[in-house]
């Protein structure tokens, strides 16, 4: 959510004690590319459903967030704060509501490839090897090179996105037909994050939502 909302990421943990799982989450270039997207526009809350299973404190809901990305792409976040796994569905007419309500946006009439932004994050074994080599600069550099991880000090996120670097796009998992829907099973207390990419000609991007900040 911090990436979708273009918020700063503040890490209060001791980086010397970072776990492989934490490194795999924090250094995911496909997620960081959303945070550093050249448009710099936050996602907007689209849908909220409180008619879900609550936890012992009576809390629980699901949310759908959506927003524009560089190059005509679209971000979709399916957030599940319910006390169970939830199958979530959102239509293109809803995803592009802020570009035109009631399905009037031209985007709804087009097909979209769906990219999972979590699918290609660093394997835990690789992350642990890198952490273990933190005091061995030669081995550290060798492991980073073998991992072929995106390095923003060499190529900016803007240039990487312009070049359609696959490391920034996530893993293509499906496509949505015109006037179709995005469907995903979202685990309890987690989120699924997707980048939608137009399969045909690009359409002019605009937003009806206002940035209040």
Question: Residue locations for each model-derived region?
Answer:
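C-terminal reverse transcriptase regions that engage the nucleic-acid substrate
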Residues: 1-7
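Residues that form generic nucleotide/phosphate-binding pockets
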Residues: 3, 25, 117
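Glycan-recognition and catalytic regions of carbohydrate-active enzymes
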Residues: 7-89, 100-104
């Amino acid at each position: 959510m911090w990436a979708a909302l273009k918020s700063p990421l503040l890490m209060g943990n001791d980086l010397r004690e970072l776990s492989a799982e934490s490194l795999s989450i924090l250094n995911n270039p496909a997620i960081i590319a959303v945070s550093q997207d050249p448009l710099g526009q936050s996602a907007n809350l689209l849908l909220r459903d409180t008619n879900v299973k609550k936890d012992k404190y009576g809390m629980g809901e699901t949310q759908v967030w959506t927003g524009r990305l560089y190059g005509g792409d679209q971000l979709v976040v399916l957030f599940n704060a319910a006390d169970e796994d939830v199958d979530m569905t959102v239509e293109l007419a809803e995803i592009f509501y802020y570009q035109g309500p009631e399905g009037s946006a031209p985007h709804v009439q087009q097909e979209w490839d769906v990219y999972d932004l979590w699918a290609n994050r660093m394997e835990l074994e690789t992350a642990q090897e890198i952490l273990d080599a933190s005091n061995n600069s030669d081995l550290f550099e060798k492991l980073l090179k073998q991992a072929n991880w995106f390095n923003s000090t060499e190529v900016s996120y803007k240039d990487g996105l312009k070049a359609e670097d696959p490391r920034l796009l996530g893993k293509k998992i499906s496509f949505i037909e015109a006037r179709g829907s995005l469907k995903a099973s979202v685990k309890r207390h987690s989120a699924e994050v997707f980048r939608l990419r137009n399969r045909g000609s690009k359409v002019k991007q605009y937003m009806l939502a206002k940035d209040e900040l």
